[in-house]
C-alpha cells in the first residue's frame, strides 16, 4: 500500500488544504441505507471495515479526475466502490459464468480489508494511497 504525505498531496494536486476535498465518511448513514437492501452481504462486510485511517486518490491512470477531490476511510472507499458497481449494474449474486454482470462481493473477495484498495486501484485504474498524518 502506497502512502502519501499531505505535503506531497498538496503538491501533486495543487491544493492548499484537505478541506478542499469531500470527506466521504460524512455520507456513511446515507450509503448504508441506500445499499443495505441492494447489496446486503457487501454492506454487512463493509460495516466491519476500519475507519481509523484516511485514504486519498493520488492518480487517475485513465487520464481523468475520476475519484479525485475526495478522501475517506477504508469503509468509505468500499461504499464508493459499491456506488460504482451499482452504476455499472453489478450484482451480488451473479454466477462466475454470467458474462452480463460482475459479482461485486466476489470481486472484492468478501470486502476483506486487504482487498478493498487493491481491487479499486486495479479495477477502476486509479491509485488510492494511505494519507500519513
Where are these regions (language model features)?
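Acidic, low-complexity, intrinsically disordered interaction modules
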Residues: 18-126
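Extreme N-terminal leader/activation tails
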Residues: 2-22
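Short acidic DE-rich linear segments
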Residues: 130-133
